[in-house]
């Protein structure tokens, strides 16, 4: 008997669900276009060496690769679209002068499951601002994310802002032993003050830096910026990341973005993001509906160095939020993947 089931972690999208995702993508591209972003379409397959340049070593396990029968080249199914944008930007400086504002949508496929009930093929829509640095570009991305979440109809969306280098500066100043660094970052991701304090006690840095390490777990919520300023006074290496964050927030707030939270103890994206990071949340979504940040090191890997910042919206999580809070889309909720499959993130978006 013919087995009509799909491979693990994949699913079909029926007409109603497909129409809803298409509507979300269309609304997002309306906003992207108003901000001056131009749409590009990119292939599902890339040469493996191109994909590898855009991912961290840990993320390479998410890549599905095979030998292309015609050419014998090793190719990969894209686990992320940003490396493709970087490759395009480097390959076509004639058509894409700096700064370039590009937007996209499409599926990405990951090899590993990240959480039960989530498919490995994920539909995204996103933007990349290439060749522009500084607080103005950071704020542009923040404002665009906030406007995008509002445009798709999410109720009470919230943007959370961090900085990849703030916690890193404190950790480095504390001079933790090599054997404890990974555990300290894991503890920070759990907001585990006790574990952070235990690791910091074995550091060889200044007393001020060692005392600041467990405080990183509390740099969210009301008063987070005040607590971060106190840390930056004690650990001067953290002052520049804090100043960059506050500068972007000031501009974004002048442009009308009000629902912004801060978490400067965010550990996500270490080794990939180089500056401000952000995530978009909405009541009813199982996780962040969007993630992004500044990744100034990526473009140089493709031969056209420069600053870059962007974000991607997870259309499935946005759909969930609309269904559960706004009461829209009833009857088109995506079917849960079997226990055999799930989703894995190729990088920190």
Swiss-Prot record:
Subcellular localization:
Cytoplasm
Q: Name one GO molecular function term.
A: histidine-tRNA ligase activity
Write out the GO cellular component annotations: cytoplasm
Q: Which InterPro entries match?
A: aa-tRNA-synth_II, aa-tRNA-synth_II/BPL/LPL, HisRS-like_core, HisRS/HisZ, HisZ
Enumerate the Gene3D superfamilies for this protein: Bira Bifunctional Protein, Domain 2
Q: Where is this region: Disordered?
A: 327-349
Q: Does the keyword Endoplasmic reticulum apply?
A: no
Q: In which pathway does it act?
A: Amino-acid biosynthesis; L-histidine biosynthesis; L-histidine from 5-phospho-alpha-D-ribose 1-diphosphate: step 1/9
Gene Ontology BP annotations: histidyl-tRNA aminoacylation; L-histidine biosynthetic process
Q: Where along the chain is composition biased (Basic residues)?
A: 330-349
Key words, A-Z: Amino-acid biosynthesis, Cytoplasm, Histidine biosynthesis
The primary site where this protein sits is cytoplasm
Per the record, the similarity remark reads: Belongs to the class-II aminoacyl-tRNA synthetase family. HisZ subfamily.
The record's annotation in HAMAP family points to: HisZ
**Per its database record, what is this protein's job?**
Required for the first step of histidine biosynthesis. May allow the feedback regulation of ATP phosphoribosyltransferase activity by histidine.
Oligomeric state and partners?
Heteromultimer composed of HisG and HisZ subunits.
Q: Misc remark for this entry?
A: This function is generally fulfilled by the C-terminal part of HisG, which is missing in some bacteria such as this one.
For this entry, the protein name equals: ATP phosphoribosyltransferase regulatory subunit
Q: Which organism is it from?
A: Anaeromyxobacter sp. (strain K)
- Which gene is the coding source of this polypeptide chain? hisZ
